[in-house]
Amino acid sequence: VVEDKPNARKAIEDEAKAKKEAIDARTDLTPKAKEDLKAEVDAIADQAKKAVDKATSATDVDKIEEADKAAIKAVGEVKEPVDKTLVKDPANLTDAEKAKLLEEVKKVNPTAKEVKYDEDGNIEVTTQNGDKGTIKPADIVKTEKDLDNGKGGNDINKPIDKVIVKDPANLTDADKAKIVDEVKAVNPNSIVTIDDKGTVTVSTPDGETAAIPAAELVRTKEDTTKPDAGNSKVVKPADKVVGEATDPAAQAKVEEKLKDLNPTAKSVKFDEKGNATVTLNDGTTATIPAKDLFKSPEEAAQPNAGNDIVKPADKAVVKDPANLTDAEKKAIEDKVKAVNPGATVVVDDKGNATVTTPEGKTAVIPATDLTKSPEEAAQPNAGNDIVKPADKTVAANPEKLTDAEKKAIE
């Protein structure tokens, strides 16, 4: 039992009580607005206390408590975007950069009456209630040298896989819960809340709070048929690496895979849990949960090889790997779909397959794992990485194999 838990719960309750008293004392809010804000405070405190109850170390308890303080402090304040804007010189923003900052602030404050620059050069946000808040441009920009800070120049991570929803304009409670879970997975010990518009607010143990607009966290089933599967420009490999998420050797293998699939990657950084943040040269960043990148030896021995997305054993024969025909792409798509029932598969001109499972997992199988030349097909292994037996096993019922039949196949 972590001894600090009772003290942490008490601190969380005191923080919530003080914030609600401050809200009640405000003269610029309607009674309804006050009740809404206080309900938000209660929800944050409740989430923090539940996280404390589940914590297994005093360090985690302390981190949760700090995240709670940041989250409660931010209630009623204007929101800053998680994704900072890449600029050349923060002290001398161009007109285009200034316009981009306004656009990003509007995305995370969708109900604001007005977002503009004030006479001091700060961004002034007028809320629905009529009260005003300001954001210093320096707090929401990053330079090229900031990109290697482990979070792509940001303070908070954004998950790589968007959640598949039926109607982005009308999120269900189940949709919201899934979104919160995805964001929490890449921001350990943080407090994560979601509003009616789908905007997610994240507060970290470092005292940072920022928001992610719904559009950057959700996609539809139709979106998964696009070349990028409706996801980030950052892509992840289908084949996980065997090893511990915190092992440097395993991380080096994952980094190599990620850089192969993301040729414009500037950096790949791992946090203490093994989550990987990939940052591209243009400042685009996304974080991949450790569970999507690493697998145990036991998982690797499972029928799916411990992966969420399965590679077909038999590669497709292509004439020119650099320029696939439509028929060749269709052959690859069919092979991938055959071993990934219900998945959406998009094959590019090089033969790389972007696969999205019904559960919303998206990963890329590189062309080298899916295609072979006619010359390779003539080799003893038929150009495949896994060799199939020439003789099929006789089975009484292919739908229900006996242990003896399984052994014969093995």
Regions found by a protein language model. Name each.
Residues 1-410:
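Intrinsically disordered, low-complexity segments of exported/surface proteins
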